[in-house]
């Protein structure tokens, strides 16, 4: 009996751990096309009635083969995200994707995806990429970086701060990324800290960054753009 109880407990722990590690809930049917007009609020979207689903719920003419405009971006990049908000058929499937265009010397600034791991491949040009670990016991945050060329692949673990930078002075770069959530979210670090609405107290930020309040006030006065479309 004791042995049976032990194995039952082990199985339950494994089941709970599996659920805790999942980015998005696993689907319980073939598909669950998002009903974005439903008044019901759930974690994700409720399903559209299966009899009303058609092939266009799984299709989007996204024009990802076309270069995107980076000229209006201070960061020199343009992220075209295809998530459940644009493609209803992604609901419950735990995946999304993005095309990222980089101007010469452009970057996708340091940011995190709180709900997804990202895997990225370079289609054109060269990218300097990296991510930083969470706070370690020794007080360090380790930086992992790599220079990627066309066809190379790099993975950014879920929730960690990461970036991509085009080092070329005269050539643009293009990448495609896949993310392990239908709605991965993005928190651009500088935008969140210095461009929040309402502003974080300059007393807090001056102490945190060990600079005077004038530097904080100047940073908060800047326009912090969102390069994600």
Swiss-Prot record:
Does the UniProt entry include the keyword Signal? Answer: yes
Positions binding Mn(2+) in this chain are 111, 113, 118, 162
Keyword Nuclease appears in the UniProt entry: no
- Signal peptide range: 1-22
- PROSITE patterns, per database record: GERMIN (PS00725)
What does the subunit comment say?
A: Oligomer (believed to be a pentamer but probably hexamer).
In terms of PANTHER family, this protein maps to: GERMIN-LIKE PROTEIN SUBFAMILY 3 MEMBER 3
Q: Could you tell me what this protein is called?
A: Germin-like protein 12-2
Species: Oryza sativa subsp. japonica
């Amino acid at each position: 009996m004791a042995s049976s109880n032990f194995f039952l407990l082990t199985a339950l722990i494994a089941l709970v751990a599996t659920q805790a590690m999942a980015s998005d809930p696993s689907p319980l049917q073939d598909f669950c096309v998002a009903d974005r007009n439903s008044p019901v609020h759930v974690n994700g979207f409720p399903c559209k009635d299966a009899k009303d689903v058609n092939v266009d719920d799984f299709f989007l003419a996204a024009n990802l083969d076309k270069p995107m405009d980076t000229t209006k971006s201070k960061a020199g990049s343009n992220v075209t995200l295809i998530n459940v908000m644009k493609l209803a058929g992604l609901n419950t499937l735990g995946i999304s994707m993005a095309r990222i265009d980089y101007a010469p010397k452009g970057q996708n600034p340091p940011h995190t995806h709180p709900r997804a791991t990202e895997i990225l491949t370079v289609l054109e040009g060269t990218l300097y990429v990296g991510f930083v670990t969470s706070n370690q016991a020794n007080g360090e945050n380790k930086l992992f970086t790599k220079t990627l060329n066309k066809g190379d692949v790099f993975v950014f673990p879920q929730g960690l701060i990461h970036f991509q930078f085009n080092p070329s002075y005269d050539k643009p770069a293009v990448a495609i990324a896949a993310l392990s959530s239908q709605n991965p979210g993005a928190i651009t670090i500088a935008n969140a800290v210095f461009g929040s609405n309402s502003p974080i107290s300059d007393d807090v930020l001056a102490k945190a960054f060990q600079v005077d309040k004038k530097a904080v006030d100047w940073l908060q006065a800047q326009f912090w753009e969102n390069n994600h479309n």
